[in-house]
Amino acid sequence: MKKTVLREYARLIVRSGVNVQKGQEVLIYADLDQPEFVQMVVEEAYKAKAKKVTVEWNYQPLQKLHVRHQSVKTLGEVPEWQKARLQHYVDVIPCRIHLMSEDPDGLKGINMAKLAKSRQLRYPIVKPYSDQLENKDQWCIAAVPGAAWAKKVFPGMRTGTAMEKLWEAILFTSRVTDDPVKAWEEHNADLHDRCAYLNSLHIRSLHYTAENGTDLTVGMIPEGEWKGGGDTSLQGIFFNPNIPTEECFISPKRGEAEGIVYASKPLSYQGQLIENFSIRFEKGKAVEAKAEKGEELLKTMIAMDDGASYLGECALVPQHSPIAESGILFYNTLFDENAACHLALGMGFADTIKDFQNKTLDECRVLGINDSMIHEDFMIGCDSMNIDGICEDGKVVPIFRSGNWAF
C-alpha cells in the first residue's frame, strides 16, 4: 500500500477521528502488527500539536501466557502505579486511539473462566476512573491489518496478498478518498439527518422481525435520542468515535425486551468466535442463549455481571452500506457491526439521554440506561429484516424494510 495513502489515513484518524487539540496528551493502543503505521499516527499527532503521545502495545500470545501462569488474584490486581496512571488520565483528559488488528482466533484455548473472573475483580477498582472520564474525552477506534486477521478474512491467499486486500477494504470502507475529511463531513451530515427524523417520531418501542425467526420487541427510554456519526465531548470537541461507521444508534430501556433474536454474523469475543447463535429475552433479560459454536463462551459473556444480560444499544445499519456491499466478512466487530443492524449486550450510553450533560450517571441509569462491565455488539441485520417503530401515540411507522431504510 502506498505510503501517501496510509499517511492520509493516519491524518484522518488524528484530525477527524480524535481531533487532537493543541497541548493535549494522546494515548494509542495497538498490537505489534503495524509499527510503521503507528509511527505515522504518532507523527500526525505531534503535527496537530499534541503535548505527549504514549503508545501501549498489546500482543495476544503474551496475554495467553499471563492467563495460563498467573493466579486469578494476580490477574485481577490493579497495583498502585496503575491507579496513579488512571488518575492522571482523569486529570489531563487525553484522547484515545485504538488501532485494531488482532487475530479473531488469537485467544483460542485460553481459560475464559479465569480471564472472566480476573476482569470481574478489576472492574470495580477501575470503574470509578472510567466513570469520571465518561463523555469528557475524545476517542476513536480504527483498524490496520494483522497477518493472522488478513488470512482469516482471505484464507485462500498468500499472506502478503491478503494483507494488501485487507488494507484496501479498510481504506475503502473508512472513506479514505482524495479528500477524506470532506467525505466524512458529508457522511456525518447524512447520518445526523436520519437521526433527526428518528427523533421526531418519538418511538416508544422497536419491533424486529426476520425470516430466520427473529421476533423481538425492545422498549425505548422516553428521554432517549438517536445518535450517529460524529459526537461532541463535554469539553465541546467534535470527534468521530468509530472509523468506519454507518449506524444510527440509541440505548434502549433496561428491562424492556421481549422475544428472540438470531445473529446474522459470527461474533468475535475475547479472541474467540461465537457462531450461529440466538438469544431469548424476557422482561429485558437474556434468559436463554444457544450457539452452534462457542455456546459456553456466549453464556460466560452474558453472566459477566448483572447488566451483561440486558441490552445497552440498538443500532440501525442498512444492507446497502459500503461494508455490507463489499461482501466481506471481517470477523471484527468494528466492521461487521457496520454491515448490519445490531444490538449490544451490556453497558448503555449515557449521552443518548437528552440533556445528559446536566445529569449525573446515576440519574441516567435511573431513566433506564444499562450499566455493565461489558459492551458487546452482535449483528442481527439481514436481507429479510423488517423493523417497525411503535410511537408514543400508538402509530406504527416502518423504519426498515427488507434490510434497508424505509425512509
What residue ranges belong to the model's regions?
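Long, well-ordered mid-to-C-terminal structural blocks that present hydrophobic/aromatic surfaces
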Residues: 250-306
